[in-house]
């Protein structure tokens, strides 16, 4: 069980995200992380650590941020380490994941992903597949990736060249989207 969130807006994104993750911490307190898209460079920076959201808050800087995603983790695949904490980043793709990808070992073998993975999680496999299929069209990459995944999941995804857009998809696992004006 994990807590995931995505946010884009005009508020102080970092504080909104970290405050929301503290509310979601009951869903997982083994590790926490956020990915933030810098307003000037559009580069996605990942901050993550084994431990609580309060530990994460201490390592995050306060640049102006366009959009972000965040995660609290209850470890299911892989130990409680900084490397296994979310978000996971592969190429232009950054994501957070809740659920279980049952066929992640087969996908690692089928797509020869072992050399590029940095964690022991099923989640990073989804990031690697998305990056594999990403050719400039996020929806097409998501569609192709999801067709390969078996299990229950919710994903919140950032693409580096889509500065103020957040994508989300789910299979069985719940996800809520809100638009505030």
Model-derived features: positions:
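Conserved short alpha-helical segments that host acidic/polar catalytic motifs at enzyme active sites
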Residues: 1-181
């Amino acid at each position: 069980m994990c807590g995931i969130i995505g946010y884009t807006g005009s508020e102080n994104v970092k504080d909104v995200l970290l405050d929301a993750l503290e509310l979601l911490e009951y869903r997982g307190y083994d590790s926490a992380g956020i990915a933030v898209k810098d307003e000037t460079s559009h580069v996605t920076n990942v901050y993550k650590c084994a431990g609580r959201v309060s530990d994460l808050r201490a390592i995050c800087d306060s640049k102006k941020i366009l959009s972000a995603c965040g995660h609290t983790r209850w470890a299911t695949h892989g130990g409680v380490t900084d490397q296994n904490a979310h978000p996971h980043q592969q190429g232009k793709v950054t994501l957070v994941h809740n659920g279980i990808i049952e066929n992640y070992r087969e996908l690692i073998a089928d797509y020869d992903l072992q050399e590029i993975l940095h964690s022991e999680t099923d989640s990073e496999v989804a990031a690697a597949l998305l990056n594999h299929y990403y050719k400039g069209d996020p929806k097409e990459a998501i569609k192709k990736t999801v067709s390969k995944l078996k299990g229950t999941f919710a994903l919140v995804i950032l693409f580096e060249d889509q500065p103020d857009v957040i994508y989300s998809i789910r299979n069985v696992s719940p996800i809520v989207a809100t638009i505030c004006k």
